[in-house]
Amino acid sequence: VIEIGFGSGSNIGLYPAEVTEIVAVEPSDLAWELSASRRSGSTVPVSRVGLDGARLPLDDASVDTGLVTFSLCTIPDVAGALAELRRVLRPGGTIGFAEHGLSPDPAVARWQHRLDGLQQRLFGGCHLTRDIPELLADQGFQVDLLHQDYLPGPAPSKPWGYVSAGRASA
């Protein structure tokens, strides 16, 4: 499994027993350090292969599965990262994703567009206005399973809480 945006390793305990290796792409040295205890407690080996999802040091069709959780919002070259992910996936490979992004509700989307610049400046480049299913389709992924909804919370949290989660095949 290649995990783009490995972060502090919070997904390690969620991998099924069939996973034999986790290849982590994580640009933050601090996040990588924070993942040390989770990595050391894992029965699955974890290796950090890169800092930039748009330039993966892996062979074509060398990975079975990908995972991206709450990372596509901050990747500067998100199209390049998804193209690279597709390149390294074996034919028929799939990715799991859970990402926040652009709401289909015009009123919420207007607020997302208004807040996007400030959001990026305050939160490490995080975008509110990325249409996740569209980004996946634009890079040749077929979205096979998709659930979209708002996270629980008060109405003012909606610009930050529209989530797309699912599975896509290469």
Task: Name each model-derived stretch.
Residues 54-66:
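A short acidic, Gly/Pro-enriched loop at the edge of an enzyme's catalytic core
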Residues 64-77:
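A short SAM/SAH-binding and catalytic strip from SAM-dependent methyltransferases
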Residues 79-91:
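A short glycine-rich, Lys/Arg-flanked "PGG" loop and its adjoining helix->strand segment in the class I
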Residues 147-170:
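Core SAM-dependent methyltransferase catalytic element
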Residues 29, 100-105, 149-151:
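Short "lid" loop at the C-terminus of a central beta-strand within the Rossmann-like core
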Residues 124-140:
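Short alpha-helix
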Residues 2-55:
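Class I SAM-dependent methyltransferase SAM/SAH-binding core
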Residues 92-100:
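Conserved beta-strand signature within the Rossmann-like core of class I S-adenosyl-L-methionine
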